[in-house]
Amino acid sequence: DWDSIDARIQRIFDHGGTFEGRMKKYLEKADLYIDDEVSVKNENPPISGRIDFIIKHDKHTDALLELKTIKNEDFHDLKEAPKHEHMIQLQIYLNLTDRDYGVVMYENKNDQNLKAFKVDRDEKVWHDILKRCEKIMTMTTEPETCTGMWYCKCKNRRKE
């Protein structure tokens, strides 16, 4: 529920939304835009998400484009590849839509500079994602600590 999300987190998501709006205009102007906010879903294991953009690509019929806004320090730390969790997200989308190629594009929140990293579909990574989902879904005991990201709701959960 949107109202239960911390106001600061809501502002972070809103900032990302303005990036998507601007990018849509740029993609349309460059005649690269095909579609946006495309929902994808896998039944088993249950995985769902929303692809930011599907764009035209000169070497592929089309490509997936995921947009991320990122703070200055993290932006400068990105050298060779996208953040692992963003690569995983794009791998899921590539595999669920049977596409071979995508891009994660970052916008620096401080100065709007951009960095983009290509991601090729990787069957091994997809297999590992499915194995991890299966492992989590079949756990019989709760983990002692949460290993999720800082925003994971499990971080604040206390064992009773």
Predicted feature locations:
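Short amphipathic alpha-helical face segments that pack within enzyme cores
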Residues: 18, 22, 88-92, 96
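Metal-dependent nuclease catalytic regions and adjoining charged, substrate-binding loops involved
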Residues: 77-83, 92, 96-160
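Metal-dependent nuclease catalytic cores that hydrolyze phosphodiester bonds in DNA/RNA
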Residues: 1-64, 70-77, 84
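Short, small-residue-rich loop/turn micro-motifs
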Residues: 68-69, 108
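Extended aliphatic helical segments
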Residues: 5-12, 34, 38-40, 88, ...
